[in-house]
Design a protein with these regions (language model features):
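Bacterial N-terminal signal peptides
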Residues: 4-12
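Boundary at the C-terminal end of the N-terminal hydrophobic targeting segment
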Residues: 12-21
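Conserved beta-strand hairpin/beta-sheet module of binuclear metal-dependent hydrolase folds
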Residues: 21-71, 188-202
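Divalent metal-coordination and catalytic microenvironments
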Residues: 44, 54, 69, 83, ...
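Metallo-beta-lactamase
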Residues: 50, 57-59, 119-256
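Active-site metal-binding motif and surrounding structural segment of the metallo-beta-lactamase
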Residues: 60-106, 227-232
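Accessory terminal helices/loops
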Residues: 136, 140-142, 227-233, 241-316
């Protein structure tokens, strides 16, 4: 899994932050040294309570989410998972333990992950634990991930998202959109026309796109769909909220990276081009970017065709 790569890098932490608009509240995820990330979370006010988009991975992140809900005096009436990666869905069980009536709106791609990706990742993680190289804190995190993988009922949707369309979630009108074969086999992204708010999940990741389960060209198409909405604020899966002009800049950087990967330019040139094009979204003290972009060039963008297209078809 991605943490096996990232925990080997010189990691720079980012402090969690919270902000929002009139009808929504943003809780920023974190990526602290020596552990995996938490994705961003967003609360939306709804007639029946609160809608929570993505639940993070770590107990500390979930404590912030629960504290906000309790401070508001409202139940979490619905969870929307943008995708099945555990830094976005790993807290489902904890949130639903506190709010057992919360429905889970999510895609069905987790079925393929449960059948193949999770078992394969678990095997690698078990070998890492057996090596004795994991710190006690990291070992505890890996075991929490195992527990999340085993709790199938918390990862699966009670309200599956199988196509794009307008729905009412906890009484609030939202557009739940399904992007096939992009950052994952099925990415759910949310557009709130009343707030002009777009919640992108890992279709947009500020510092560098995570291609671990990505289909590059499908992802490029999904970004065009995002651009078609008249949003004013976009919440990425990781990183700070963006205006539409900022998103367009990020989308250009994404396209340039794919285009560079398709040429015979040196890998270092493609890495440098990403760092230049996406400079506004990369923290100045983050030393992970060179290794991460190089890794994704080797493992996905310039991999042999079968590997490059591995996640451009169903995992099941």
């Amino acid at each position: 899994m991605r943490w096996l790569l990232l925990l080997c890098l010189a990691m720079a932490g980012s402090a969690p932050a919270a902000a929002g608009g009139k009808g929504w509240h943003f809780v920023r995820g974190s990526f602290e040294p020596g552990r995996g990330p938490d994705g961003n979370s967003v609360f939306l006010d709804a007639p029946e309570g609160l809608i929570l988009v993505d639940t993070g991975r770590h107990p500390g992140h979930q404590e912030k989410l629960l504290a906000y809900a309790h401070a508001r005096g409202k139940p979490v009436a619905a969870i929307v998972n943008t995708h099945w990666h555990l830094d976005h869905s790993g807290g489902n069980a904890e949130i639903r333990a506190a709010f057992p009536n919360a429905e889970v709106h999510a895609g069905t791609a987790v079925d393929g992950a449960l059948a193949g990706f999770f078992p394969n990742s678990r095997k690698a993680a078990e070998e890492f634990l057996a090596s004795g190289k994991a710190s006690p804190e990291l070992a505890a995190e890996i075991k929490r991930d195992f527990a999340a993988m085993d709790d199938v009922g918390s990862l699966k949707a009670t309200r599956p998202v199988t196509r794009s369309g307008e729905v009412r979630v906890a009484g609030r009108r939202l557009q739940l959109n399904l992007a096939p074969f992009a950052a994952t086999e099925g990415d759910v992204w949310i557009y709130d026309p009343d707030e002009k708010l777009l919640i992108a999940g890992d279709l947009v990741v500020g510092p560098v796109p995570f291609f671990d389960t990505g289909c590059p060209e499908g992802w490029r198409k999904a970004l065009a769909e995002l651009e078609s909405r008249p949003f004013e604020t976009l919440i990425p899966g990781h990183g700070a909220p963006m205006t539409k002009p900022q998103f367009l800049r990020w989308r250009t950087a994404f396209g340039n990276l794919l285009d560079c990967a398709a040429t015979d330019r040196e890998k270092a040139e493609c890495v440098a081009a990403w760092k230049r094009d996406a400079a506004a979204f990369i923290p100045a003290d983050d030393r992970r970017i060179d290794e991460m972009v190089a890794y994704y060039l080797d493992s996905r963008l310039r991999a042999p065709p079968a590997e490059r297209g591995k996640y451009c078809r169903p995992l099941r």
